[in-house]
Regions:
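Amphipathic alpha-helical assembly/interaction segments
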Residues: 1-129
């Protein structure tokens, strides 16, 4: 199992993925995206709304799956996928704003959260070597 120490308490080894702050932030982001996309037009239910939800869910899911991999190399691969999902979701949030589905303030708030997760992911990749 990987020995990752990314948490507020640097002396504590993370044993389960649910203790990772990055995973916890990902879960919060999923909830935000679900609440936000609920307000989209009904004709987007199988379009942008569904795509954003799947993309958001993939962020903490890939963090969790990677954490359970035995080698850091595999873990890093899942974290790179997480970075891709973050970029994809940020693009979808911008599109939602351009289509007037969300307000500027909501867009900025979500983009800030996505970028925060991206930074945490990049730091974790570097820490894994």
């Amino acid at each position: 199992m990987t020995n990752v120490e990314i948490n507020a308490n640097k002396n504590r080894k993370i044993k389960i993925f649910k203790d990772l702050r990055i995973w916890q932030e990902g879960i919060k982001l999923v909830k935000d995206i679900y609440l936000l996309s609920k307000k989209f037009p009904k004709d987007e239910i199988y379009g942008l709304s569904s795509q954003m939800r799947r993309c958001a869910v993939s962020i903490p899911s890939n963090i969790a799956e990677g954490f359970r991999r035995y080698h850091n190399k595999e873990y890093k691969q899942f974290l790179y996928i997480t970075l891709g999902s973050c970029a994809e979701l940020e693009t979808q949030v911008i599109i939602s704003h351009e289509l007037d589905y969300i307000k500027e303030e909501a867009k900025e708030e979500i983009v800030e959260k996505i970028q925060y997760i991206c930074k945490m992911t990049s730091r974790l990749i570097k820490k894994l070597g």
